[in-house]
A protein has these predicted regions:
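Bacterial signal peptide processing site
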Residues: 7-9
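Primarily the internal scaffold of c-type cytochrome electron-transfer domains
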Residues: 11-17, 25, 40-113, 147-148, ...
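Local sequence-structure signature of Cys/Sec-based thiol-disulfide redox active-site neighborhoods
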Residues: 22-36
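Short HxH-centered metal-ligating active-site micro-motif
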Residues: 34-37, 164-168
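Generic hydrophobic, aliphatic-rich segments that mediate packing or membrane embedding
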Residues: 41, 118, 131, 159-163, ...
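N-terminal accessory interaction module
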Residues: 89-91, 98-102, 111-138
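Propeptide (latency) domains of metzincin metalloproteases
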Residues: 122-127, 133-160, 166, 170-178, ...
Length: 385
């Protein structure tokens, strides 16, 4: 990690106020600390789906979701869920078929998901316990729906365990870290929302203190650099959350740290997934591993195509250029394929990494009807029409 400039540096060590502390002693600080020397990287990262994968809700953001959308979700048992503003908060209320009084009214305290592709689901605090609410917002249709995985009836509370937050936050402090069994109780003011610098680069306190005292040293010290990691270590960093649920964890959530090997933390890892398994919570890394492009190079990893510091979804020019950097001089015979007759040959991803129906994530967009979410496969290949 290099430094473009350090315009706001401190010339002596200044105590950093930690947001939380990992059981291994690592202190988490705010990303404003990184702004001192990495302003451009931080500002671009703030716009990424990774950083926005969890956040405390604001009234303004929730009001935007209420605008021009049907804020009622009807369930098959006759229960209705209403999402409405109440004072300076937005709440979800559940009503029995003939009742005028809500069965419950719960505040929407935390948003999970960036809302860029699929949408957002919402969590509610009950003292120190965290639960998922039953109504979620589906962004493509600007529609409120029954949350994924819920039956079409008023469901019991769904607790949010650390394994959920492990992939939707940088860190969440358990109320009782020494407990042998993980539960859904947390220290509310010790959650580091979103995926920030520390999740991928490890502890930063020593790094920050060194460079505040040595602002002219342009070589990053006391920080993990991805260039120092092997390809397998780099892949494992992404596979922690992008190799899905076909694994069994044998250590507590948040135990995995950058540079660790995932097989020391997970068992039953499916490294050769079939192309049919394509889900944002499933097998991007395994699908990539099963691709000829990956198998025929010793250097390809997730960051060959993805810059984690930038929001680049839909940037066809960039992704096609990456494909072309290896596949120079490739020609197609459009007369042999009807799909090619309809394309300008400028969208490699659309044909060779097509959207596919997810077998794991389905949404109830209509009463008692499930529709699969489409996810772009990461098994690069030649597909039929």
């Amino acid at each position: 990690m290099g430094f473009a400039s350090c315009q706001n540096f401190q010339t002596s060590e200044v105590a950093l106020t930690p947001l939380a502390q990992h059981p291994n002693g690592m202190l988490y600080v705010g990303m404003e600390t990184c702004l001192e020397c990495h302003a451009d990287l931080v500002q671009s990262h703030l716009l990424t789906p990774h950083y926005n994968t969890s956040k405390q809700t604001t009234l303004g953001a929730l009001e935007n979701l209420l605008a021009n959308s049907n804020t009622t979700v009807k369930l098959n048992d006759g229960t209705s869920l209403f999402i409405e503003k109440e004072g300076q908060q937005v709440v979800q209320k559940a009503f029995a078929p003939t009742s005028q009084e809500p069965l419950y009214a719960k505040t929407m305290d935390i948003a999970i998901g960036s809302g860029k592709k699929i949408g957002q689901t919402f969590l509610n605090w009950e003292e120190s316990s965290l639960f998922q609410l039953q109504a979620s917002h589906f962004n493509p249709l600007n529609q409120w729906i029954n949350s994924p995985g819920y039956g079409s009836f008023l469901a019991p509370k769904r607790p949010i365990f650390p394994r959920c937050l492990e992939c939707h936050s940088t860190y969440a402090q358990a109320e009782n870290p020494s407990s042998p069994m993980e539960n859904n109780r947390y220290v509310q003011n010790q959650i580091v929302y979103g995926i920030d610098c520390q999740r991928c680069h490890g502890p930063v306190v020593e790094h920050v203190n060194y460079h505040r005292k040595n602002p002219m040293d342009s070589i990053g010290k006391n920080i993990l650099k991805y260039s120092q990691l092997s390809r397998e270590q780099r892949l494992d960093m992404c596979a922690l959350c992008h190799q899905g649920t076909l694994e069994q964890s044998n250590q507590k959530s948040f135990a995995f740290q950058p540079g660790d090997r995932l097989n020391n933390f997970r068992t039953q890892i499916n490294t050769q997934a079939s192309k049919q398994v394509a889900d944002v919570h499933a097998n991007q890394v395994a699908l990539l591993r099963s691709s000829a492009c990956f198998q025929q190079t010793k250097t390809m990893d997730c960051m060959t195509c993805h810059n984690p510091h930038r929001a680049e979804a839909g940037n066809r020019v960039k992704f096609n250029a990456i494909c072309a950097s290896c596949h120079q001089g490739v020609t197609h015979a459009p007369a042999e394929n009807a799909t090619l007759l309809k394309t300008s040959f400028s969208d490699c991803v659309q044909c060779h990494m097509p959207l596919q129906d997810s077998s794991m994530m389905k949404l109830e967009l209509e009463l008692d009807s499930l529709f699969p979410v489409q996810v772009r496969t990461h098994k690069i290949g030649i597909y039929g029409e």
